[in-house]
Amino acid sequence: FEGMLKRVWKDVLDHDLPTPFPRMPYHEAMDRFGVDKPDTRFALELVDFTETFKTSSFKVFAATAISENGAVKALNAKGLADITQGELASLEEIAKSLGARGLAYIKIEKGEWKSPIVKFFSEAERAELQQRLGIGEGDIIFFAAAPWERGCAILGRIRLEAAQLLVKRGKLTIPADQWNFLWVVDFPLMSYDEERGGYAATHHPFTSPAPEDAALLDSDPKAVRGQHYDVVLNGMELGGGSIRIHQPELQKKVFEDVLKIPADVVESRFGYMLRAFRYGAPPHGGIAFGLDRMVALLCGTTSIRDVIAFPKTQKAQDLMAASPTPVTPKQLRDLHIQTVVPEE
């Protein structure tokens, strides 16, 4: 697969892609970049300060830091202290849309740390922030205090927005002709669904667990890594796939013991597959690849509408084919469709 991409980039752009592509575990991608499809062409990485703030006088951070799965993370948007109130309000709305109560920040202007929260920080806490974030004049530090995954996602989105603001100001360059391919691997096999009160498959229920983690299915399903992989380029997922379960006993365990699907439902929906596996299905897997996304990137556009054969408008109209068009009564009869016009 990497060989195919290498050939395409060479033939189309005369660019030599280095292979093999780097591999980044899901946890690292979220922890450093706040997203499972990181754009690694620029830094602005997230830094974890959970341990730092466990005994802090700032109760919001301290309470999160000592809570189960809580995390306090920070991001230094270097040179963005000149952010406008409108831009700051927009970032805060984005953070709130992802579950944050607000967006804490510190501006560094004229050598002074400007923020209502600074008064709660000890000298040791300030020193660690300074050292690990490389804080300098004109910087702005954004914080997220939340359950780990949510906190990462909040700052991950702020990271992308801040990068665009820095690009607009000429303070950051993101090369359009830099192709940072990587594989994101080791996704969690299961995630806990709070509403349903049980586990759900992160990818799909046929993904095979990592062999060394399979024993944890009984005791700690959320700690099991799945053999799921995504190929990512410059912050865009080009494709994803997995190695599938091929052992009937393991597949049945995932259905019934982990996902809690009733045995009769498993039999009615998947019985044919479990029986087929008993005849010796080999280990197998694959990948679903977004050809249109790849072509869009090669053409220098971010919208697949520019490269697909029959793009649709926002109203789902195909302007080239002038569709959709009215259907005839005969077509409706052939398909046994009856339309009912509401009474006015």
Predicted regions and their residues:
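Class II aminoacyl-tRNA synthetase catalytic cores and aaRS-like
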Residues: 1-344
